[in-house]
Design a protein with these regions (language model features):
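Residue-level detector of buried hydrophobic side-chain packing
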Residues: 88-90
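Bacterial N-terminal signal peptides
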Residues: 8-16
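N-terminal secretory-pathway/extracellular module detecting exported/lumenal segments
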Residues: 21-85, 94-160
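Intrinsically disordered, low-complexity segments enriched in polar/charged small residues
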Residues: 7-8, 150
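Positively charged n-region of N-terminal signal peptides that target proteins for export
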Residues: 1-4
């Protein structure tokens, strides 16, 4: 019984570590991937619409999660264009009025053809600069709208 349990535990650890290749063509052709921000710094941000979900909502916070692709376009100055596949969690504290926060739960890196370059996880929570309208803010606004039916700006207007 112990041996079976340890084999199951090992399988649970090893299987998620395998990275499934994804190319730029696959991202563009998938109807669930919505381009949110294009052209700035030769980077396009796609959100996998099918991955958007509410994580937590109560009297204190809104939390939503989604898979985001950050794709460096071929016209960038780099010789090796890349793709980041990122699982992100956006959080808004209603009571604290601390703005939008972002936690990166996992990152998988690929070259343009879809060959895996590496994987990372659990990047700490960071504040998103709402005033600058940075890409993380625009992406987060879209994710909140899809998850809750309202954008981040409207959430902040209606807080108590």
């Amino acid at each position: 019984m112990k041996k079976l349990f340890s084999m199951l535990l090992l399988a649970c650890i090893v299987i998620p570590l395998q990275i499934q290749a994804i190319s730029m063509e696959a991202i563009k052709n998938d109807k669930n991937n919505i381009p949110i921000l294009t052209g700035k710094n030769a980077i396009t941000y796609f959100v996998d619409k099918s991955s958007i979900k509410r994580i937590e909502e109560n009297q204190f916070i809104y939390k939503a999660q989604a898979v985001v692709y950050e794709v460096e376009n071929n016209n960038s100055r780099r010789t090796n264009s890349y793709i980041h596949k990122v699982l992100v969690t956006y959080r808004y504290d209603k009571q604290a009025s601390s703005g939008m926060k972002l936690t990166i739960n996992s990152v998988e890196d690929f070259n343009y053809k879809g060959v895996a370059l590496g994987a990372f996880s659990n990047i700490p929570e960071q504040y998103v600069d709402v005033t600058l309208r940075d890409p993380k803010y625009v992406v987060g606004n879209y994710i909140f709208k899809e998850a809750y039916g309202t954008t981040f700006e409207n959430m902040t207007l209606h807080k108590k």
